[in-house]
Structure formats: structure tokens, C-alpha cells
Amino acid sequence: MTDVTVKALAAEIQTSVDRLVQQFADAGIPKSADDSVSAQEKQTLLAHLNRENGSGPDKLTLQRKTRSTLNIPGTGGKSKSVQIEVRKKRTFVKRDPQETERLAAEEQAQREAEEQARREAEETAKREAQQKADREAAEQAKRDAAEKAKREAAEKDKVSNQQTDDMTKTAQAEKARRENEAAELKRKAEEEARRKLEEEARRVAEEARRMAEENKWTDNAEPTEDTSDYHVTTSQHARQAEDENDREVEGGRGRSRNAKAARPAKKGNKHSESKADREEARAAVRGGKGGKNRKGSALQQSFQKPVQAVNRDVVIGETITVGELANKMAVKGSQVIKAMMKLGAMATINQVIDQETAQLVAEEMGHKVILRRENELEEAVMSDRDTGAAAEPRAPVVTIMGHVDHGKTSLLDYIRSTKVASGEAGGITQHIGAYHVETDNGMITFLDTPGHAAFTSMRARGAQATDIVVLVVAADDGVMPQTIEAIQHAKAAGVPVVVAVNKIDKPEADPDRVKNELSQYGILPEEWGGESQFVHVSAKAGTGIDELLDAILLQAEVLELKAVRKGMASGAVIESFLDKGRGPVATVLVREGTLNKGDIVLCGFEYGRVRAMRNELGQEVLEAGPSIPVEILGLSGVPAAGDEVTVVRDEKKAREVALYRQGKFREVKLARQQKSKLENMFANMTEGEVHEVNIVLKADVQGSVEAISDSLLKLSTDEVKVKIIGSGVGGITETDATLAAASNAILVGFNVRADASARKVIEAESLDLRYYSVIYNLIDEVKAAMSGMLSPELKQQIIGLAEVRDVFKSPKFGAVAGCMVTEGTIKRHNPIRVLRDNVVIYEGELESLRRFKDDVNEVRNGMECGIGVKNYNDVRVGDMIEVFEIIEIQRTIA
């Protein structure tokens, strides 16, 4: 090998020159950068580096886990799954070359020793077999010689005595023949014994050779990984063991049967009798004498199916599935379905049925029914509450209702001396506002409801939670639709009404007109003999505000409103929404008791501990008494507006009740699903022709979601339907955007915005996202989108009328009508009608239009022309030709 310099070697092995010089110095070879390096010096350096750094790892351990599932059959035809984990570990040891050579030499020596032992064993076996065969042959030869001498002596005796006695000779011949046969049989037996000995010797030698080979493979071969499936191998072993067991049983049975046939058992032998009896009993249990039943007979049961029907006590809750009912009655689901079909009800095995239907089916099938009350836990939680006995007077809860823009919020705004209305989008109220006001005569709690038509359900909730309704009517506008609706809500809730005639300061105000209109709906003023107080007010000027408050307090005094102030609180959710920083927030109006910070509350489907309470001004409060509205934080989710709020003792039980209510709501919803009836079949067949506007709706509060959903669903027509794919409270999330993309829906955000992840999905999928803050605009735009889906209306518009004055014959067009245009314009290639005595006799197309032998496109009023009608020759003088065109009119939703 050619010597290289230290610098070149460093470049070749990709290391620095200084490091390589240092390594040479450590190895005892002083070098500089320009010195040459020989092959011997390279080997010396390599050996030094190996000693310093060592080699790779001497031992490597591999671990492997295999997880699988084994299905084990259980009782009742059900099977359970067992998780099985097989762990394998293998260690590889790296040996040095000297150790490897030594082990190879030892293995070679061991193999040679085993081969020598095998050969010696074979030689020994052969030698023993040969010696035994020689001994047998020598003994046989001696026996043959003795037999021969005996035969010769017998023959001599026979010859000597032949003349004397023929009868003796015959007997001797017979005897000799028998002796020959016995000798032949004996010889054959000896040969068979010798053959068996030789086979035994060969078998011993083969066994020795096989054991030697197994030892060799066991000692030398590396253990291989078991790649077979654990469960397949296990089941194969199980089947083999079962087959061997069956073969042993069959063999024992056959042997016992043959033994019985060969020799009858002794009467006095009790052991043999008991053994035979056991065999017979075992055979009877395992399937008798049938040949097919013998296989696997050891695993069969001796259970006999009961012949009589078993009547059971079946416990049925409020709802139950068909499959669960079948399990409780211990019958197959198909039998329950058949019984329901006999009763006239169609059902599937997973369908939820109500308690009455399940009771009828169970009683029809002969079982006793026990009806279970599932709300026992809920009743127990509700009964375990501290409620004080002494009731005290409380402040009235007043709901301000009326038509939109009649000044409800402005009136309350003046009372509270704040500017709330300016903060509402569009100047209209879209939430329920709850406020309490301290006056000189006492405290009053006000609920401000929306007046827009979309917020019917909100107004209904406000009327149910209130004591007194203040009906605001504009003096210049009179009674309007939402005013009438507010009267209906108040009457339905049985709440007294105080009428505030607002905008009394306007010149066009007419309070008497308002009284007359309200009297038509059962609201009569006191001066007319009615029960309602009428107060003239002006929210702008502040006129009559004190009189209105006095009227409210007077009405409250008449009602004698009282509530328990001490003890656990109960109330109602006025409004709820999801705040990004604070979580679910609910506006609660306390009816009884005192709500404290830290109380555990149960609220519809939700529960939680009150972590914080704020009043309507956003100030933290520690407690809230009757008729006080507060915002509470800490619920598990956003409750539905109108839900009952109850303080309970145990959070665990509150959670159980909330989960039970959720499950019950879901089951009831499934049970109410429409059954497949014949009349629905035709309705479903036409659904494919209906266009759908899919909407994913998110709003800031629960009430707005409810109101907008109701308003949009009411827009549906026979041709276009609005479908709310998803709705909720809070900002637009990625999940909402994905849902809208999957269902081809419009994303609508009412006073909410989309987060960053949702915006990415919206941009990627090019979704239609729209933000609104006023409900008018939202409804108008959805109407416009629905109008675009309506098929246009086709309308025929008459553009010209011509009278036939003469008829000419043309070789090209046939009959050509010479006409005078009497109305409008005649256009070529337009559809026409031929009228005779004002009766349409033909409808077709105008093919040829000429004026003085020239083809023209149109002929105006008062001019003559020739008209050729396509595929029609029966034109007569006096006929009228009506030319029209079809125009499309875009339809809109009113």
C-alpha cells in the first residue's frame, strides 16, 4: 500500500488534522501534518482506537407484545371477549472471534461425539439382535434334531409293527401328521419372534439417532420467533386434544363392548358390573349409540328444554326497546315483533316503545307487568331540600310587553335612568333584559321582552315568570299584532295587565282610540267598569312615570305577593348564553329562598356549583333573594331558557338527575318519531322534488337561537324548505364549519363571530358565511336565498293580432294568409294561435312572414303582410291570428 501523509489521511477519514495528530501521539507514534503514514502505523492506530472507544454493544434485547381478542362462549348464547397479551423477549449476544471459534470447535466435537455414540448404539443394537437371533437359531436346530430323531424312531417302530397291526399304523400316521403340524406352527412362531426382535433393534437404533439429532438442533440452532397466530394454535391444540379424548373414549367403549361379547361378566364380580354400568351411563350422556353424536360428545349438556311456558314478572320503565323487552321475558325478539304485529304495531328490534305498548305486549304474551317510576331519584333529590316555613312579602316581577317600536325599552330606560336601548342593534330589543329598580315605595323587578314577531316564545316565557304585565301601546299607533299577542300571553298566564299608553306627548296621540281598540280584546279600563289600570306616559319627557310605578305597586299590593326568603333557592332561567371567557352563563330569576355563591344547582339537563353571581350592572354579589335577577356562572352547559333552577344538597345526585333527564329526553324523542305509515309513503316520494335551504345557526344567547329558528322554519313553502342543520350558543367553531361544508349549508352568525380555525375551514371550503346583528336583515336575506330556488313562473304575453283578409296558395308553404295587422306587432318565429269565431282551433309557430314578396322579421300595426303557418293549411278568410311570447317571471316569497 502506498504511504499517505497525515493531512491526506485526515481528509480521507473526514476529521481534523490536529485531532488525527493527537490520536497518533496517544498511540505512541509522533507525527506532524506533513509526515507520511505507513500501513503498519494505520493498523496500530486502529487497534489503539478500538481499545479506547470499545466496540458496539455486546448484547441486544428485543421485546415484542402481541395483543388479540379471544371470544369465549358463555351462558345464554352470549359470548364475551377476553383481551390477551403475549409478551416475547429475545436476547442476542455478540461474541468475539476467538470465542466464536472456540464454540464452533466445541460444537463440532460434540457433534462428532454424538455421531460416534449413535454409531456405537446402532452397532450394539445390531450385535445384540444378531446374538439373540443366533441363540434362537441354535435352539431351533437342537429342537429340529431331536424332533428328527424322534420321527425316525417312530418310523422304525411303525415299520416293525406294520405287519402286526394295521389299525395301529393308521393311528401312528395320524399322530405323526399332528406332530408335523405342531412343529410347523412352532417354527413359524419362532420366526415371528425373531422378526419382532429385529424390528425392535431397528426401532431402538432409529430412536437413538433421532434423539441425537434433536439434541444437536436444540443445542446449536437459534430459537426462532413463533409467527403463528396464538389463537389459531390454541384452537388447533384444543381440537387435537378433544379428538384424542374422543378416540380414547371410543376405544375404551369398543374394547369394553368386545370384552362383553367375548365373555359374559361374572355375576359375583361387583367391580366389573359397576364398570360396565359406568360405561353405559357415560355413553348415554354423550349421545347414545348414534354415530354422528359421538364426535364431541364429551362437551354436550344434559339440559332439557322446559315444556311449560314460564310466566315472569317483567319490570317496564317509561320507555324500553323491543330487544330489552324480549330479554326481560326470556324470548326471542322475533316473537315480540310478531306479537306487536298482531296488535297492529310495526316495530324493529332496536325501536324504542312507550310503557303502555310494552305493557300490552307483555300481558298478551302471558307475563305479569310491574310498572316502574323512573323519576324516583329526581323526586328524592327534590324532596331533600331546606325550605323555610315563614313567607314574607316580596317585590313584584313586572314584564313590559307590547309591539315593536312602541317604546318599551325606552320607558324602562327612563325608569332606570340609563341608556340601554342605544346599545341594542337596530334600536330594537332582541334579548330578555332583567333589572330590579329601587323606588320610594319599594323594589320592582322588570323583565323587558322583545316586541318583534320572531320572539313569540321569549314573550311567552316572560309572561309565565311574571306577576304583572305592563302593556305598552303607542298612542299614535294603536293596537298592533304583537300587542294582541301580548294580551293573549297575559291571559294564558292569568296575569293582571296595567296599560301604559306611551308617546302621549305627540300631537297625533289618541288615547281614547287605544282604549276602544283594547276593549275589543277584553282589556277594559277601570273607569269603564273593567279591572285594568290605564296610565298615560311619555318615555321621552318622563310624563306619568311615577303614576305608572304607583299603579304597579298598587296592583302588587292587591295580589299580596309573598315568598319564603330563607332556605334553598328555586327559580327560572330567563336567558342563557355561552361566554368565551366565562363559559355557560344563565340569567336566573329567583322565586323562593336565597341563592348563595357556592350553592349546587340543578338546571334542566345541566348542573353545577355557582362559582360567581353578578347583578344586571355587572357587579359581583354573594346572594340573591326572591324576585332578584342574577347571572350565575359554573354550570356544566348552557341550559334552555325557561328551565327550572333548583338548589340541591349533593352534587353527585344532581349530576345523576341531569344525566337521567338527558337520557329520558333522548328516549322520549326517539319514541315520538313518526312511525312508518302508508299515508307518509306518498309524502316521502315527493320530497326529492322539494328544494332545501340548509342553515347552520349560531347566536349569542339561547333565546335568539330559538326565535330565529322558529322564524326561519315558518318561511318554508311547498317548493322550498328551510332546514336548520345545526344550532347553538357561542361563536362559530371549526365543527360548525365542517358541518356546514358536509351538508352544503349557509353559516349564519347572529351577534357572534368565527374563530381562527373555523375561518381556515370556511376559506378552504369556500363556505357562505353571513353575520347579522338585526333579525330583520337575517330573515330578509334568507327569503331572498329561498326566492332564488323557486322555479320561475311562465307567463304568455300577446304581442300582436292579425286578421285574415284573403288566402293564397304557395308551392313552398301551402296556404298563405294575407292579413292586416290590427293590434301590436307580428314577429317571425314566435308561437301563434289561430282563432275562428273567438275559439282557438290551432296553436303552432309562425314560419314565414312577408311584405310585398320580401321576407321581414316583424310587421307593425296597420300594415298588410303574408303569414305562413307551420304545418297548417286550413286558414280561412275572417280568422284571427294571435302572436304571443312566453316570458319568465321570477317569484319571491312574501
UniProtKB/Swiss-Prot annotation:
GO molecular function: GTP binding; GTPase activity; guanosine tetraphosphate binding; translation initiation factor activity
Keywords in alphabetical order: Cytoplasm, GTP-binding, Initiation factor, Nucleotide-binding, Protein biosynthesis
Pfam family, one: IF2_N
Domain tr-type G: 393-562
Localization per record: Cytoplasm
Sequence segments annotated as region (G3): 448-451
Classification via CDD domains: IF2_eIF5B, IF2_mtIF2_II, mtIF2_IVc
GO CC entries: cytosol
Region annotated Disordered, chain positions: 47-305
Positions of the UniProt region annotated as G4: 502-505
Region (G5): 538-540
Keyword NADP attached: no
Family: Belongs to the TRAFAC class translation factor GTPase superfamily. Classic translation factor GTPase family. IF-2 subfamily.
UniProt name for this protein: Translation initiation factor IF-2
Taxonomic source organism: Citrobacter koseri (strain ATCC BAA-895 / CDC 4225-83 / SGSC4696)
